[in-house]
């Protein structure tokens, strides 16, 4: 009986291990394909897309760097990502804190409003967003920043709300008795206690903003990394080599950021869901 149960357990582990390997290969192969082809001439890629480079060809990186004007679009994208993510975190954390600690009944209605907005697809509101951006003279790269604040806050508020509810109110009351003001309590007591969910929101929103294509296409038209990569996708000819090189270069910063904070993602989402 024990032998049978151990055998079944071993079989399950083998199946699980094989499944994980298959899924890992499935997700890693596209990245491997892009990196390998970034070192191959465009003619070789067209003839044999899945081949390996005969020798290291760095011309794709030189072409991508020049044609994309990479330093400029990189700084633009970095500015939008940092300011957009930072604004979402500060605004959403303060809003969620106000909703959690508010004694007004309308607070629950406002929270339900934010939660409901999560189910609205972006494609439904992208035309009104374009019209609004034009009316507010936000049709530029800096104009993307307040747009991301508005689009990213509902999800962040939902995540912060569940986490802030777990913060003991007695800590805030003790600080208030000692004369601490609301802003001091929020920034010095509440925020340090929710740093896990802050890191989670930072990673999720940074990945979203850095990789976003549709909103910059509607609002900015040009000036970000994702839009600059369109120049390699012509109507009659595609420069696969420089395209792969540009994808490789642009992926390095956000992958490094994700790897640095990845441990907070599952921890923060799981804790926020349970505490919410």
Language model: regions and residue ranges:
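A structural signal for multi-pass alpha-helical bundles of membrane permease subunits
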Residues: 3-276
């Amino acid at each position: 009986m024990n032998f049978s149960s151990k055998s079944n357990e071993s079989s399950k582990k083998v199946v699980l291990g094989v499944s994980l390997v298959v899924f890992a290969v499935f997700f890693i192969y596209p990245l491997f394909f892009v990196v390998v082809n970034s070192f191959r001439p465009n003619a070789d890629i067209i003839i044999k897309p899945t081949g390996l480079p005969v020798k290291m060809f760095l011309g794709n990186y030189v072409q991508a760097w020049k044609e994309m004007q990479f330093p400029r679009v990189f700084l633009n994208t970095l500015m939008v990502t940092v300011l957009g993510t930072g604004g979402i975190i500060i605004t959403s954390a303060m809003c969620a804190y106000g909703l959690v600690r508010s004694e007004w009944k309308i607070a629950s209605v406002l929270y339900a409003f934010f939660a409901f907005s999560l189910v609205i697809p972006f494609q439904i509101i992208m035309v009104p967003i374009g019209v609004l951006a034009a009316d507010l003279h936000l049709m530029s790269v800096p104009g993307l920043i307040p747009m991301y604040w508005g689009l990213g806050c509902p999800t962040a508020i939902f995540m912060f709300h569940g986490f802030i509810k777990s913060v003991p109110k007695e800590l805030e009351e003790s600080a208030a008795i000692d004369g601490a003001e609301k802003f001091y309590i929020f920034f010095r007591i509440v925020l340090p206690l929710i740093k896990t969910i802050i890191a989670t929101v930072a990673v999720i929103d940074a990945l979203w903003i850095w990789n976003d294509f549709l909103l910059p296409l509607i609002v900015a038209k040009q000036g970000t990394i994702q839009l600059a990569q369109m120049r390699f996708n012509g109507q009659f000819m595609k420069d696969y080599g420089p395209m792969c090189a540009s994808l490789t270069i642009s992926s390095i910063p956000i992958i490094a950021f994700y790897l640095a904070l990845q441990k907070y993602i599952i921890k923060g989402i799981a804790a926020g869901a349970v505490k919410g």
